[in-house]
Regions:
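A short acidic, Gly/Pro-enriched loop at the edge of an enzyme's catalytic core
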Residues: 101-112
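A short SAM/SAH-binding and catalytic strip from SAM-dependent methyltransferases
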Residues: 112-124
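A short glycine-rich, Lys/Arg-flanked "PGG" loop and its adjoining helix->strand segment in the class I
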Residues: 126-138
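Conserved Class I S-adenosyl-L-methionine
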Residues: 54, 191-253
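Short alpha-helix
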Residues: 172-186
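Class I SAM-dependent methyltransferase SAM/SAH-binding core
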Residues: 48-50, 54-102
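Conserved class I S-adenosyl-L-methionine
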Residues: 1-42, 56-60, 77-80, 143-165, 204-207
Length: 253
């Protein structure tokens, strides 16, 4: 019998906590800059960073809000967030461990729920969004950032394949339309969005997750077999580096 999805996520990310804290891809980006703009002016807000990983959302918004709860399945990730928060003097960041599908917070506990590069690991995507709605105050805002599927079936199949080969805890990168539909179903009103193109250097992308050599070779073999449509959209280079689509989507409770 294999591990549960939660156990798989924990085993994938726990040992990689230092790599994700240090990751330039996760530590910076136009989406983080825009996020800071959106939360500025909410000096007393209580914020939930859902699936916080290495804590970069928490670190960016903490100086601009009242309190941030960094929430993640991985104890090791949370320990890293606590350490870096202390190093940076971010006294208004606390941590909490748990699953996104069952948040240990009362209704209306937060003014803002933020999440970045986490939702594609959620086993219960819709359940998690329902929980986001529950813990937000009336008219509270969710700001959700993730890799998105470009939509067309061929491009989608390629993206999901390389993601799962790299990281077996991957579930799905959703399209923007799928996100909007799921938010509506959860009782959240989708709002403004931004889209971005994110360049990934192949060797560091693989190293960050400590991907098995056989799986890394399979990704390179798949890339070499792809049609021009895939090569062009993902801008796949000879060394395997490529570009993906990401988004920032706002929603209101």
């Amino acid at each position: 019998m294999g591990p549960s999805h939660s156990q798989l996520v924990g085993s994938q990310f726990g040992p990689r906590s230092a790599a994700y804290v240090a990751s330039a891809v996760h530590a910076q980006g136009a989406d983080l800059d825009h996020l800071v703009e959106l939360v500025s002016g909410h000096a007393t807000a209580r914020v939930l960073d859902l699936g916080c990983g290495g804590g970069h959302v928490s670190f960016h918004v903490a100086p601009h809000v009242g309190h941030v709860t960094a929430y993640d399945l991985s104890h090791e990730m949370l320990a890293a967030v606590e350490r870096v928060s202390a190093e940076r003097g971010l006294a208004n960041v606390s941590t909490q461990q748990g699953r996104v599908e069952s948040l240990p917070f009362p209704e209306g506990a937060f003014d803002l729920v933020l999440s970045r590069y986490s939702a594609h690991h959620w086993h219960g995507f819709q359940s998690a969004l329902i929980e986001v709605k529950r813990v937000l105050k009336p008219q509270g805002k969710a700001i959700l950032m993730d890799v998105v599927s470009p939509g067309p079936a061929l491009l989608d199949t390629y993206l999901q394949a390389v993601e799962m080969l790299r990281d077996p805890s991957h579930v799905r990168n959703y399209t923007l339309d799928e996100w909007r539909s799921a938010l509506c179903e959860a009782g959240l009103a989708p709002g403004a969005h931004e889209v971005y193109r994110l360049r990934l250097e192949f060797n560091s992308w693989i190293a960050r997750m400590n991907t098995a050599r056989l799986h890394a070779q399979a990704i390179r073999s798949l890339q070499a077999s792809m049609s021009e449509d895939v090569l062009r959209h993902f801008e796949i280079d000879a060394d395997g580096s490529f570009t993906i689509d990401t988004m920032l989507l706002e929603a209101t409770a």
